[in-house]
Amino acid sequence: MSEDNSHSREYVLEADSELRFEIEQKDAKVLVTLVTGFAELFGTELVKKKKYEFGVGAKVAIFTYQGCVLHVSGKMDVCYISKETPMVQYINCHAALEQFRMEAEERDKRGPVVLIVGPMDVGKSTLCRILLNYAVRVGRRPLYADLDVGQGAISISGNVATILIERPASVEEGFTKTAPLVYHFGHKSPGANNVLYNAVVSKMAEVTLQSLDANKRTKSSGIIVNTCGWVKGSGYAHLLHAARAYRARAVFVLDQERLYNDLLRDVPSNVHVVLLPKSGGVVERSKELRHESREQRVKEYFYGNTRTPFYPFSFEVKFQDLRLYKIGAPPLPDSCMPIGMKAEDNKKKVVPVTPTPSLLHHILTLSFAESTDDDVIGTNVAGFCCVTEVDMDRQSVMLLSPQPRPLPPNALLLWSEIQFMDNHA
């Protein structure tokens, strides 16, 4: 059942069903209140009598194990109740992971590392959120690694990132992204530089696995790893590489039997490969919608949101003070490479970038590396700025930055293909 609901009404949900709604119109606002019973949004429990607000772009699925009554008011493009939901299978996956965690705790071993894989638009990041929320609700402190450089659930697009999850996600805003570990990649698809992507994933896996050992509670909690939706050809090779790099204990495959069978064949026999259905509420996103989503994440990085607004700074930097580089030189045949080097080494080479008008709107990554002699690929990110103006006459650029001028001493900036049109009034 689909309906155009622009008024207040109550929805009565039976056990193991969910209310799904979408908001597509700008400036639309929907308020949801749990009246009676128990309900959750992607693993986060709703508090009775508390009003939750959702805005444009929201795709919501409120699930109940025992039945509930929800009061909903506002303008929605789609709203219906579904009894066809994979949530029972998802909580069974949580129960299996929790069994692994208990065993790891008893033996003082690392907890389970699970990769969430599948094609685009099957609900991978949603399943990650559900499993992470269930884990912290039983006292765990798992790590969340996001290898999806196209959308970015933790950082902005063009990066891989990891955060420690200590409390359930906010119903309205998701997880608190405090002190993330972020590594620069600089592209929105791994295929733009396959060699660099694998190197960045390997470094993130190495550092993340080591960090598990720093805290006993986190050690046994393990890691939930979100992956890209590119699952064929080189994309599939990236999934296998990630499984090896993270020493995955399990791989949860969403909605693609062929991928499931390929992984059963290609991963070690001690890795549990599980095929799971996607939710019927998952919506396929167009290229335009993906682009808008990337832009929105960058906008929130600089300007925050209506609940927590940020006020970024804009300042001029002369070309001569801009230490700007790009990772990945143009490909050369092996015969043209210096002795002892291979063509793929060029893909990880740090090369200087000369400022030109083409820099306009590009995101620049501020690295903690101070010199190109440092391990730039393996050095985490301090933050981001955006080029809002290039003045060739003045030999300068204007940067949008979360921090005021000047740039830190010895600031090393890395070019990214990610762009942001700063139209903020």
From Swiss-Prot:
User: What Pfam families does UniProt report for this protein, alphabetically?
Assistant: Clp1, CLP1_N, CLP1_P
What biological process terms from GO does the record include? mRNA 3'-end processing; tRNA splicing, via endonucleolytic cleavage and ligation
Would I find Signal among this entry's keywords? no
Give an example GO molecular function.
polynucleotide 5'-hydroxyl-kinase activity
Residues that, per the record, bind ATP: 18, 59, 121-126
Task: Provide the protein's localization.
Answer: Nucleus
UniProt GO cellular component terms: mRNA cleavage factor complex; tRNA-intron endonuclease complex
Primary localization class, coarse:
nucleus
Going by the entry's taxonomy, the superkingdom of the source organism is recorded as: Eukaryota
> Does Nucleus show up as a keyword for this record?
yes
Record keywords, A-Z: ATP-binding, mRNA processing, Nucleotide-binding, Nucleus
The family note in this entry says: Belongs to the Clp1 family. Clp1 subfamily.
- Function per UniProt: Required for endonucleolytic cleavage during polyadenylation-dependent pre-mRNA 3'-end formation.
Q: What is this protein called?
A: Protein CLP1 homolog
Annotated source species: Drosophila virilis (Fruit fly)
